[in-house]
């Protein structure tokens, strides 16, 4: 056997036995604000695989470190997404030959706010919805001007309103 084949086989065995520490970011905002471009440029185009055909999502995957679920609108079954966003060794389903998942970063990119994904599952399978939320490390919200703000899932769903204080005159104080 050639050294390349031997190292490839060893690599495949290694990948099937190693937990991948995953970072998952949910990105949403209006169209044309640079959501996808920001990820591809930030991570490097050659490091990214973008799912756009949700009937055969992984046929073109070649071991890239970054997975983009682009134009996502609850496009894959929730139980499948839970597997794709977890770090356990995973074979990705493909038409001709399954592929080993090697990515450690995943981005779900959409025009929809996070709470508009999997709406029926939020009520019918709340434990699965909660499992999805636990896998998401960051919610990135893009504005029309292309600027964005990052939140944890908790911060996103429970925005903290910082109290404001007013200066009052001593005569207005009841104490």
Task: Indicate residue ranges for each PLM-predicted region.
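Short loop/turn elements that form and flank the Walker-type P-loop nucleotide-binding site
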Residues: 7, 21, 62-63, 101-103
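Phosphate-binding P-loop
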Residues: 15-22
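A generic structural signal for secondary-structure junctions
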Residues: 10, 43-44, 86
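Generic beta-sheet signal
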Residues: 23-27, 65-69, 106-108
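Glycine-rich phosphate-binding P-loop
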Residues: 23-44
């Amino acid at each position: 056997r050639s050294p390349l084949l031997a190292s490839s086989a060893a690599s495949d065995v290694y990948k099937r036995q190693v937990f991948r520490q995953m970072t998952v970011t949910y990105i949403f905002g209006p169209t044309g604000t640079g959501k996808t471009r920001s990820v591809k440029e930030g991570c490097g185009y050659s490091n990214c695989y973008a799912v756009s055909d949700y009937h055969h999502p992984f046929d073109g995957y070649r071991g890239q470190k970054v997975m983009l679920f682009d134009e996502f609108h609850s496009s894959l079954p929730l139980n499948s997404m839970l597997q794709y966003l977890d770090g356990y060794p995973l074979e990705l389903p493909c038409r001709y030959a399954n592929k080993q998942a090697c990515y450690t970063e995943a981005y779900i990119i959409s025009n929809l706010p996070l709470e508009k994904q999997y709406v029926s599952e939020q009520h019918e399978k709340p434990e699965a919805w909660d499992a999805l939320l636990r896998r998401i490390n960051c919610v990135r919200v893009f504005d029309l001007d292309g600027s964005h703000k990052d939140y944890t899932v908790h911060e996103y769903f429970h925005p903290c309103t910082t109290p404001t204080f007013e200066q009052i005159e001593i005569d207005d104080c009841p104490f």
